[in-house]
Curated annotation (Swiss-Prot):
Official protein name in the record: V-type proton ATPase subunit E
Coiled coil: none
Domain of life: Bacteria
Source organism (scientific name): Borrelia hermsii (strain HS1 / DAH)
Lineage: Bacteria, Pseudomonadati, Spirochaetota, Spirochaetia, Spirochaetales
NCBIfam families: PRK01558.1
């Protein structure tokens, strides 16, 4: 009986040990499967994250290039506009320099000579130009100056003059600003070709 108990104990130990080893093998196998699944998922997630990061980096690069191109275009446009503005200022200054009293006198006399003799006209000038030119124009235009032609001072004109039909809507603008604007519009297409940067 003692052998039977011993055999029984040995059998229980052996069965328990076998069961424990079987259970341990299953646990290890399950752990290996879980570990492999975790590794596969981690690798898959890593690939997905890498692809997403590469995609975002590519999009960022494209957006950066587009932003850079736009910045360059804006810079070119701003530079062209600044150069045009400087050109326009220089043109206005040059035209204003030409508009001295002698030039104004000659221009007014020519315009008055070709204007219809029966029309009454007003010549609108800067206040200082009126006082400087009045006596010279009296000599050249004669008796028409008070009757058919009247000189009118106007603070809004810096250089040059305007001629207007009295009691009419027709007028011609010979101010330095207007002449410079007309010249600028005429020269602008050629000027654009000169400063064309891109």
């Amino acid at each position: 009986m003692q052998f039977e108990v011993k055999d029984l104990i040995n059998k229980i130990k052996k069965d328990g040990l076998e069961e424990a080893e079987k259970l341990a093998s299953e646990i290890i196998l399950n752990a290996k499967r879980d570990a492999e699944a975790i590794i596969l998922k981690a690798e898959s997630d890593a690939k997905e994250l890498k692809m997403q990061a590469e995609k975002e980096a590519g999009e960022y690069k494209i957006h950066s290039l587009e932003a850079s191109r736009q910045a360059v275009r804006d810079l070119i446009i701003a530079t062209e506009n600044n150069i045009k503005s400087l050109f326009k200022i220089a043109l206005k200054d040059s035209v204003s320099e030409v508009y001295d009293d002698n030039f104004l006198r000659e221009l007014i006399i020519r315009v008055v000579d070709i204007w219809s003799k029966k029309d009454k006209i007003d010549i609108i000038l800067n206040e200082s130009a009126v006082s400087n030119l009045l006596s010279i124009l009296r000599v050249n235009i004669g008796n028409r100056l008070d009757d058919a032609i009247e000189l009118k001072p106007f603070k809004g004109i810096s250089k040059g003059f305007k001629i207007q039909q009295r009691d009419g809507n027709l007028y011609y603008d010979f101010t330095s600003d207007t002449i410079a604007d007309i010249l600028f519009e005429y020269l602008n297409p050629r000027f654009k070709e000169v400063i064309k940067l891109g």
